[in-house]
């Protein structure tokens, strides 16, 4: 006889702490493209396997991934439009002290907590591969004379890190992405930022 837990796993179900999920999605969604003509990038990619829930987003100029421990279940890779991610964030704000559940059946995901629920359809686009970019950024840092970047992006990192927290930047070469290290209590962050062209 199958157990309730077996049934949850069978239909793609994962459960997370509301406050941690809120922090994760607020941070990751800040890096999603706001260009609705790019539906694959105007979205957040999520998945959960082996007790680890991951979310990532990119606008082509920066890339971020955050991961946290899940309470229960698994969820196959799913691309969620930014509009719907904002709805999930709103639900999490109302349930920071509670657990939040994701349940996927087919192309439909329902996010719920204590009777409140929203349902939406996942995007059908193919998310760009990102793991190799993160792997390449882990190589030995290099010394460079100077680098230009968008300061507004750094402000987003400051919000993710929290008040009085430091972030650390690693340079991997001229014209290559900078690796941004953000330390979190419950979330493990990985972030990359492309330099800008600049003429003196």
Predicted regions and their residues:
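DNA polymerase processivity clamps
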Residues: 1-200
